[in-house]
């Protein structure tokens, strides 16, 4: 079947729209689908995503499409950009409509709810082994990407040809640098763990602890990410790149991050529900915390920062209690395996 579009994006939120804008601005005909027909009609009418990226026009090559079957028939390249808790649901909806030559890439950052499984496991369980899979990850704020500000990300997958094609599709000398990576596992994990650490950094700043504490959390958060990555077969070098250190620093230090702002509100004494309501969009780190905590417990990996964030979000703990618990931990060598 011939393509009538170069790529189809599933997910018309802020990040899905930003990636679609970048692709279309790079000269690629791009279809974007969302689960709410009214939202897609608004995109068609306004030629912008006023709900998530107000004031940023959609390029002519970006076509909103409300019908999932039409969107999936248009291209064999499918980019999934939905929250992690609906990732499996969207794949189940898409499966009977996928072309036989479909290739699936996602920019979803997270793990499977309740189980903490990597999204590649979810995808394989739903789709089987016939489709090439890939993941995009790295330090990206949707608003900056959509506005054409310089950005860099990484891509890894199960099929080298697909990975290389994605680099060609996404890379733009003017706006987006794309690095190929061979660590499919590591790129998936980094995008989930960094959200948890960003919440902790936000809580620390909300309490008023300052730059020293924030930097310590980022540094030890990277240790936790690396430790968990090693336990599931990721490459340590991945976490010094875009999907590890890069995404971690961005999300922990800039208030464009919903996860950081969520943590700030918690540190200032607001409860979980109020803090989430103030953000007004999905706070991925809320669910990511439970996912990462579940995975770490299953693998027997020590992750003290993650554990304390989990206690605040799910067990009624407070940010002050979390800080006390971390500071009161037994003295250890920085270079030993346990924290």
Curated annotation (Swiss-Prot):
Q: Which reaction does it catalyse?
A: sn-glycerol 3-phosphate + NAD(+) = dihydroxyacetone phosphate + NADH + H(+); sn-glycerol 3-phosphate + NADP(+) = dihydroxyacetone phosphate + NADPH + H(+)
In this chain, sn-glycerol 3-phosphate is annotated as bound at 109, 138, 140, 194, 247, 257-259
> What is the disulfide pattern of this chain?
none
Catalytic residues (positions): 194
Q: Which residues of the sequence carry a binding annotation for NADPH?
A: 14-15, 35, 109, 142, 258, 282, 284
Localization per Swiss-Prot or TrEMBL: Cytoplasm
Q: What is its main location?
A: cytoplasm
Q: Name one Pfam family in it.
A: NAD_Gly3P_dh_N
EC identifiers of the protein = 1.1.1.94
Catalytic class of the enzyme: oxidoreductase
Quote the InterPro entries the UniProt record gives: 6-PGluconate_DH-like_C_sf (IPR008927), 6PGD_dom2 (IPR013328), G3P_DH_NAD-dep (IPR006168), G3P_DH_NAD-dep_C (IPR006109), G3P_DH_NAD-dep_N (IPR011128), NAD(P)-bd_dom_sf (IPR036291)
Which pathway is this protein assigned to?
A: Membrane lipid metabolism; glycerophospholipid metabolism
Task: Output a single Gene Ontology CC term carried by this record.
Answer: cytosol
Protein's GO biological process = carbohydrate metabolic process; glycerol-3-phosphate biosynthetic process; glycerol-3-phosphate catabolic process; glycerophospholipid biosynthetic process
**UniProt cross-references to PROSITE patterns, sorted A to Z:** NAD_G3PDH (PS00957)
Q: Which UniProt keywords apply?
A: Cytoplasm, Lipid biosynthesis, Lipid metabolism, NAD, NADP, Nucleotide-binding, Oxidoreductase, Phospholipid biosynthesis, Phospholipid metabolism
* Molecular function per GO: glycerol-3-phosphate dehydrogenase [NAD(P)+] activity; NAD binding
Q: Which HAMAP family match?
A: NAD_Glyc3P_dehydrog
Into which family does the record put it?
A: Belongs to the NAD-dependent glycerol-3-phosphate dehydrogenase family.
Which function does this protein serve? Catalyzes the reduction of the glycolytic intermediate dihydroxyacetone phosphate (DHAP) to sn-glycerol 3-phosphate (G3P), the key precursor for phospholipid synthesis.
- What's the protein here called? Glycerol-3-phosphate dehydrogenase [NAD(P)+]
């Amino acid at each position: 079947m011939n393509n009538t579009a170069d790529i189809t994006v599933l997910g018309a939120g802020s990040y899905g729209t930003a990636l679609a804008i970048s692709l279309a601005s790079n000269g690629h005909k791009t279809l974007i689908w969302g689960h709410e027909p009214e939202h897609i009609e608004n995109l068609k009418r306004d030629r912008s995503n006023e709900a998530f990226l107000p004031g940023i026009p959609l390029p002519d090559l970006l076509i909103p499409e409300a019908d999932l079957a039409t969107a999936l028939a248009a291209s064999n390249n499918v980019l999934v950009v939905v929250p992690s808790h609906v990732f499996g649901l969207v794949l189940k909806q898409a499966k009977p409509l996928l072309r036989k030559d479909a290739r699936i890439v996602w920019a979803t950052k997270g793990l499977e709810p309740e189980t903490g499984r990597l999204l590649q496991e979810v995808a394989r369980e739903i789709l089987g082994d016939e489709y090439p899979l890939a993941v995009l990850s790295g330090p990206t704020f949707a608003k900056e990407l959509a506005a054409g500000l310089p950005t860099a990300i990484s891509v890894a997958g199960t099929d080298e040809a697909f990975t290389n094609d994605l680099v060609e599709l996404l890379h733009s000398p003017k706006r987006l640098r794309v690095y190929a990576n061979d660590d499919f596992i590591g790129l998936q994990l980094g995008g989930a763990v960094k959200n948890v650490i960003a919440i902790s950094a936000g809580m620390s700043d909300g309490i008023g602890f300052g730059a020293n504490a924030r930097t310590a959390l980022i540094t030890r958060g990277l240790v936790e990410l690396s430790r968990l990555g090693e336990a599931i077969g990721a490459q340590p070098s991945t976490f010094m790149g875009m999907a590890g250190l890069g995404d971690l620093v961005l999300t922990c230090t800039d208030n464009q991050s919903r996860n950081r702002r969520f943590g700030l509100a918690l540190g200032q004494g607001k409860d979980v529900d109020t803090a989430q309501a103030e953000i007004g969009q999905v706070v991925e780190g809320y669910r990511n915390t439970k996912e990462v905590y579940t995975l770490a417990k299953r693998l027997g990996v020590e992750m003290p920062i993650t554990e304390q964030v989990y206690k605040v979000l799910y067990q009624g703990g407070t940010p002050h209690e979390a800080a006390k618990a971390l500071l009161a931990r037994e003295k250890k060598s920085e270079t030993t395996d346990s924290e």
